[in-house]
Amino acid sequence: MAGPRGALLAWCRRQCEGYRGVDIRDLSSSFRDGLAFCAILHRHRPDLLDFDSLSKDNVFENNRLAFEVAEKELGIPALLDPNDMVSMSVPDCLSIMTYVSQYYNHFAGSGPAGVSSPRKGLVLSSPPSEASTPADPGDRAQGEECSSGSLSKQGSHRTPSSTCAACQQHVHLVQRYLADGKLYHRHCFRCRRCSSTLLPGAYRNGPEEGTFVCAEHCARLGPSGRSGARPGTPPQPKQQQLTEEAKEVEGGSPSPKATAGAEADVPKASPEGRPQVPTKPRVPGRPQELASPPASRPTPAPRKASESTAPTPPTPRPRSSLQQENLVEQGGGSGLVNGKLQEPPIPKPRGTPKLSERTPAPRKDPPWITLVQAEPKKKPAPLPPSSSPGPPPGQEGRQVENGGVDKAAPRGPEPKPYNPFEEEEEEPPAAPSPAPGPAPTPPESTPKSLHPWYGITPTSSPKTKKRPAPRAPSTSPLTLHASRLSRSEPPSATPSPALSVESLSSESSSQAPSEELLEPPVVPKSSSEPAVHAPGTPGTSASLSANSSLSSSGELVQPSMDRTPQASPGLAPNSRGSPGPPPAKPCSGTAPTPLVLVGDKSPAPSPGTSSPQLQVKSSCKENPFNRKPSPTASPSVKKATKGSKPARPPAPGHGFPLIKRKVQSDQYIPEEDIHGEIDTIERQLDALEHRGVLLEEKLRGGVNEGREDDMLVDWFKLIHEKHLLVRRESELIYVFKQQNLEQRQADVEYELRCLLNKPEKDWTEEDRGREKVLMQELVTLIEQRNAIVNCLDEDRQREEEEDKMLEAMIKKKEFQKETEPEGKKKGKFKTMKVLKLLGNKRDTKSKCPGDRS
């Protein structure tokens, strides 16, 4: 016969030619000993097995070796069982043909020189066609041996393994799935709990016999609600069975293995490589994962920081949102500035506030700056409780009270001003003033940046507008005032009456604790945020004028100088424009500097005052770091800087902000999309199985020879299509598992960082044990991800090669005219058409008419 069966038989003969003990006379008994399968595998992949070591008498081992190698290495699912091959003297012809056709699909395109090019083309183009393609005119004679009658004769014959081990129902060829030497319906081999497709080596026996459970349960991948129809139906009602199976068919098809083994059968795979999965909203097992991937990927370090930060901006400023997230919880309840109790972001002098979406690390101006501005503007620095006649603590007063002095009380009656340095456990404040503990929390103190670094920046001077309220440090009110001045960011140029030195001094005397207030430097506001934001609080101007008057008084000047080391003039650092935090707490120094100059009683202070104000404003608009000090103040600033010379604080060690990194592959597929595509594949597989059962019945029931050839072509094509769908389904399951591993890796890494963030001296034995466990788990996760990635890459490579071979075949001279339309479709041309074409060719080309007989 010149049909597909003859072509397949001829191809097998050519592949096994020259191998001892292998004689291909038909597509049934000739394959019983398993040597023919091994010979085909060895010819194309001699590295997979040692043919010379095989014995013709060892039927079971030969077949077992061939089936296992084909499944694991080539992704060809085993439709046959070694025990059946041993028990039957004449194996089922249709089963052999179906199984060998997959070898043909896989190898024909890349077959040895012995295989003709036309054959190769056919092979790749369609699994069914493979049978017909290989046969040469001379080969057809032998192909006839397997007459159509053989199939019908075997129609009633059922192999011993045709019963499903799970549901005890008959299993048709198109439904077969072999696992651990047992036969199952494809839809029966699924996880009992989550109904997802079982992957090779990733399942264990369930509580009941014949059931299986995933090694690791994932969000349900199988089609929703379909798992219930698990039991197979009796073979007789094929349609019913298929329908039921269709519903049941979740994904437990042999494909998982095939995928792992890298199925290369048909080029079709290439389009599937990573097709866009139908976006079908299903069970969003990990919605967060899906949503976050885009953002997390781009951000190098702070990918996941945003998650943790749930900013609640007290006073939304243009940029406060960013800082809020970054801010660490402030000591005082009110101290919690916009920022959440988030780990301090790495200070970045300038960043675009847009990063706020990624709250993790404010890239713009130091988040502390924004935060400070937002809150401090509204709330003046709290005056020392004793002397401050200003508004009650609860009251936020930006306006200057008592002669223009900013006396607004702290937000709350909190006596402790938030000390950013103190809050940062790890980093001692580089604050210029050695303030003992946080005094009444100045509103701005709350915004203290998360990290001591932040407090360190002298640039903040423009920032502290509200601070103008004199804090009477024990050293001198002037110092307090100066520090305030440096920090204070003149809300407005409104010249409020200079603070009277008396008021200052009285306040200073009354408030010894004010020193502390002074010490907590206000977080410098980023230049990007205009100082203008703060309503023109006369406090700043008042403080400036106060400074001048104080400086004239002279007595205060010295104390301020003493403090100078701590408070190196903020101007100097600003002039440097250093992006990093300037020397510790030089901000306070700004005020002192003018004071020192004033000490000479020169009127410079007042000009200085105005200039600082202007500078402050400008600095708000521009980056404070780049701001240049006013000429009058610069000398003193320089001196102060030299004197205090606060060293830049070292990068935070244990206090480094913890960011949950999102581990994600480049091609992320939302979980809902994976579920949707798997549902679609399941429906297609159900339909194919339904057709396959009916087709198998017809083939076994007996049909005329001409009709049988057409049916065989359809059969091979159907088997191949099923194989491709199963492969894609398996790939999706691997992708889903990979994404779960990625999520788990992110969690483990974050937990490990949290552990390592703790000073080693504070570690307990439990911490050390936990570290080892986490490290081991991390290594395991990475290895598992690597294995899946390698497997998927191999599959993709093989599919690309198949596509290339298919294209080459289509262009072959012999098929150019006939297959030109198909060639345009690349892998999508009709298999049946090509097979028929080949059959006609064979008739016209045959050199020996006698070959047919």
Curated annotation (Swiss-Prot):
GO MF annotation terms: cytoskeletal anchor activity; metal ion binding; phosphatidic acid binding
One Pfam family recorded for the sequence: CH
Modified residues annotated as Phosphothreonine in this record: T312, T315, T457, T459
Motif stretch (NPF2): 623-625
Species name: Bos taurus (Bovine)
Record region (Necessary and sufficient to associate with tubular recycling endosome membranes, mediate phosphatidic acid-binding and membrane tubulation): 690-853
Domain commentary: Probably exists in a closed and an opened conformation due to interaction of the C-terminal RAB-binding domain (RBD), also described as bivalent Mical/EHBP Rab binding (bMERB) domain, with the N-terminal calponin-homology (CH) domain. The conformational change is regulated by RAB13 and may modulate MICALL1 interactions with functional partners.
Disulfide pairings: none
Residues found modified as Phosphoserine: S292, S306, S388, S460, S461, S474, S476, S568, S611, S730
Secretion signal, residue range per the UniProt entry: none
All copies of domain LIM zinc-binding, residue ranges: 162-224
Feature: compositional bias, Low complexity: 495-515, 541-553
Identification of the protein by name: MICAL-like protein 1
Alphabetical UniProt keywords: Cell membrane, Cell projection, Coiled coil, Cytoplasm, Cytoskeleton, Endocytosis, Endosome, LIM domain, Membrane, Metal-binding, Phosphoprotein, Protein transport, Transport, Zinc
Membrane-related topology note: Peripheral membrane protein
Keyword Methyltransferase attached: no
Bias kind Pro residues: ranges: 381-394, 429-445
Predominant localisation class: membrane
InterPro entries assigned: bMERB_dom (IPR022735), CH_dom (IPR001715), CH_dom_sf (IPR036872), F-actin_Monoox_Mical (IPR050540), Znf_LIM (IPR001781)
Domain Calponin-homology (CH): 2-108
Compositional bias per record (Basic and acidic residues), positions renumbered to this chain: 355-366
